[in-house]
Every structure is written in C-alpha cells, then in structure tokens.
C-alpha cells in the first residue's frame, strides 16, 4: 500500500512541477493598444517654422481610422485635414498614420499622444513638451 501512495504522490508532483515550468515562457501581452482607452480626440498646439504654432486635432477611432487636422495659427484659412487608416507597431504602443512628408508616428500614453519624429523616435530638446497631444 505504501508503494501505491508513493507512486501517486510522485505522479502528482511531476504534473504539478510541469505546469509551473510551462508558464515560464509566457510573454506579458499588456500594451497601450489593449490596456488603454485610446480611441477619442486628442488636441494640442505644436511648434511651426512659419507661424505662431499649429492647432492639431487628431481623432482616433476603434476601427483604426483617423482624422487629422492642422490649423496654422495666425494664418486664417490655412487648414489641412487628412483621413485614413493607421497601423500599430509590433509592440502595440506606437501608431503610424502613413502620411508622406509629415510626422505621422505617435506614441500612446495614458490620456495623451506623443508625436514622434519622421523616423519614429521621440523628439528631445527644449520643445519636446510641445509635441504632446492631450485627450479631450
């Protein structure tokens, strides 16, 4: 009888240890895309070379479409709107609007978007804080 009990405990131990080890390779799948309430309207004023600034309005929709409007301050009637679909990067924290010749990478954070440079890197320096759009 002791032998059967020993074998039973051994089998249970092996299965228990196996289930613990199988979780070791699990990857944390939490990212901005699936953890944040990212859909909505983001606004801010970004620097401009030929105007006092640019009023930026970016609407992100749950179906991965967007509407981006640039309205140049001190230049009435100089407004541009782009619409289309955006793509997520592999890690789910950066979107690309896919607009040629325009910065179209944005990093998602809690209730804000951080505009990235043309190559998808964070803008640094004195003006970096001006490239943040806040969620309305």
Task: Name these PLM-found stretches.
Residues 1-5:
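Positively charged n-region of N-terminal signal peptides that target proteins for export
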Residues 21-24:
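Bacterial signal peptide processing site
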Residues 26-43, 58-61, 81, 134:
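N-terminal helix-cap/turn-to-beta initiation motif at the start of protein domains
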Residues 52-90:
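N-terminal glycine/threonine-rich, aromatic-flanked beta-hairpin/loop signature
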Residues 80-88, 120-136:
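Edge beta-strand at a domain terminus
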